[in-house]
Amino acid sequence: MGSKADFLASLPEQIRSPNNCWAEKLPGVPYNYGYRPSLAAGASFIVLFAFALIYHLTLSMRKKRWVSVALSYGAFVELIGWVGRTWGSQCPYNQHAYLMQIVTLIIGPVFVTAALYILLGQLIQIFGPESSMLSSRMYTIIFLTCDWVTLIIQAIGAAMAASAQRTRKNPTPGTNTMIAGIVFQLATMAVFAGLAVDFLRRISKSASSARSIGDVDGGSVPKQYYSVLTALFISLVCIVARNLFRVVELAEGWTGHLMLHERYFVALDGLLMVLAVWIFIVLDPARLVDENRDLFTRPADVERVIHKGSLEVEEAEHGGRGSYGAKEYSASQQAY
């Protein structure tokens, strides 16, 4: 008889089936979570993520925006995770509910970070190559590849850890794999944050250059784009904070203080992820950008708004030769 079968046979009859729904605490047999999950918390997060899913999914179908598609996936995965925890609140010994929430809630943020990477890549296309150290295409390829690597590592680690927990084996290999995936994601996000700050610096500098030569119209970035960047940075900070919490929580182990007290998970995972997704409902890039897209439909308009100052300064310094012309920018606009 295999070890898993031996383990199941040793369990009390009430929870021997993986599909059991025994709610009462059994003497000497801890709940899968170390506690009984809160029904109120689970139901609240189901409502919040379900609304976000419906909003972003509807937007992705209407606007055909990849940012909305990625946010839809993120909201959906988080929703499934909290459905699992709500199920676990009624059936705290149920193995399927436990596995369901462990795998989905560890990988959910990966889809939201994908939305951030796509969003900044699109902003780079709008403002032109002078606004970034990397081309928008290379930017998207590099960061989305890192995101997929993160997703695979974390999913494998979560499955390993959940399986070990379910059969009361050593979960350390799976836990360490999960930590490695989160740390890799944090490293990727640190590089992303640096490039995002550089992007903000570059577009602000271009606008300042325009003002310095008396171009009032071209001396400012439309406020809608600052709103989009505000949403991006808020979401980024939330996910970084959530990831740091999960690293500390997992490093403490499955019997650590953070792991055994649900309030930390609710505040530092659930609430932070709600904010990371909901900020794009309050400050929706598709709505803000599309409503003001007429500012960026013609190369001449783009030069007037953001590039005119930097181009004229460069022409003065290099004998009338600007480094970036309307023809090249028109090509980048068509790619958006």
Residue ranges and their predicted role:
Residues 98-110, 154, 171-189, 225-285:
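Extracellular loop 3-seventh transmembrane helix
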Residues 43-49, 53, 68-75, 102, ...:
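Residues within membrane-spanning alpha-helices of integral membrane proteins
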Residues 1-18, 201-224, 285-336:
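Intrinsically disordered, low-complexity terminal tails of fungal membrane proteins
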Residues 2-109, 113, 121-125, 131-141:
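Membrane-proximal first intracellular loop
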Residues 50-57, 106-132, 148-162, 186-204, ...:
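Cytoplasm-facing ends of alpha-helical transmembrane segments in multi-pass membrane proteins
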Residues 146-149, 158-187, 191-228, 241-244:
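Membrane-interfacial loop- and helix-cap regions that link adjacent transmembrane helices
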Residues 56-65, 90-94, 123-136, 196-228, ...:
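Juxtamembrane membrane-water interface segments of multi-pass membrane proteins
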Residues 28-30, 164-172, 254-256:
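Membrane-interface helix termini and inter-helical loops of multi-pass transporters
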